[in-house]
Regions:
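N-terminal FAD-binding dinucleotide-binding subdomain shared by FAD-dependent oxidases/monooxygenases
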Residues: 1-291
């Protein structure tokens, strides 16, 4: 067990210290960027190919990938790296924007993934009837400790706004959030609470501090266009500090940051017949389908 902890620490600490350069003092990333550019020069002999694969932005602005065989694969004689955009897909190939037609047997589409506009958000509705998708679209993806959102009582989720990482493992963050949510459930049960909802002013203050911390980060100022930034220009995906700092603030559920109503004070829910429940479910299903 002791050796396992040492092995974990030797992997964790070097990655964790990168956040100093990524989020707090970007100048500290210069040696790493120099090493990366030197690596490209050593791996890629062809000047034109080297030009294509050399980023024109600061290291860390986009997610850093570690690979021993990526550049050698691109340098193989049977590989062409085409950076022109695709203008058209034909029956047996693709046409790039420079007018060149290339026949292909298969097209692998690697267009990324939904982060700030996940399809699941459209099916979650708050106390005012607005969906989570509508709220995030209007204001940007904001939450409290990545687990709760103002206007959505009794809703907790994992890997929410500003819990992503650009330097180390997400597992540590997920474990931290699990501790927070489990403690929330136990607190609600222990105090016989009917509903909890994070206070809007608490959420606003939390996000204001996050955005202030992110203003000087490589992710915001590194000169690239990435999925880290939303259409409002805010970085609503990444945590701008050490992961152990996030674990500290999620160690216990902070009930005072929430509005709570005792279960005994909630109005009774009218009894529904099986037919009424079925009609409600069908209506909700039609709403989701229509969206």
């Amino acid at each position: 067990p002791g050796f396992q902890r040492l092995s974990r620490a030797l992997q964790y600490l070097p990655r964790e210290t990168q956040v100093v350069g990524l989020a707090k003092a970007p100048a500290f990333m210069k040696p790493l960027e120099l090493a990366a550019r030197t690596h490209i020069r050593r791996q890629i002999a062809d000047p034109e190919l080297r030009r294509k694969v050399t980023p024109d932005f600061q290291i860390g602005c986009k997610r850093m990938l570690i690979s021993n065989n990526y550049y050698p694969a691109l340098a193989r004689p049977n590989v062409d790296l085409v950076t022109d955009g695709i203008a058209e897909v034909t029956a047996d190939g693709i046409v790039t924007r420079d007018g060149t037609t290339r026949q292909v047997d298969a097209i692998v589409v690697a267009t990324g993934f939904h982060v700030t506009d996940s399809p699941t958000f459209a099916g979650i509705f708050g106390k005012d009837g607005r969906s989570l998708a509508d709220v995030f679209d209007a204001t940007g993806m904001q939450g409290y400790k990545g687990a709760a959102v103002a206007g959505f009582p009794n809703m907790f989720f994992l890997v929410g706004p500003n819990t992503g990482l650009g330097h180390t493992s997400m597992v540590y963050m997920i474990e931290s959030q699990l501790n927070y949510v489990v403690d929330a459930i136990e607190t609600i049960d222990r105090h016989r609470i009917g509903t909890v909802e994070v206070r809007a002013e608490v959420q606003d203050d939390y996000n204001r501090n996050l955005q202030d911390a992110l203003k000087r980060s490589v992710w915001n100022n590194g000169g690239c266009a990435s999925w880290y930034l939303d259409k409002h220009g805010n970085n609503t995906t990444l945590w701008p500090s050490f992961t152990f700092e996030f674990r500290r603030i999620t160690r216990h559920f902070d009930l005072d940051a929430y509005r709570s109503v005792a279960a005994a004070d909630l109005p009774p829910v009218p009894a529904q017949t099986p037919a009424a429940v079925r009609d409600t479910d069908e209506t909700d299903a039609r709403k989701v389908a229509a969206q």
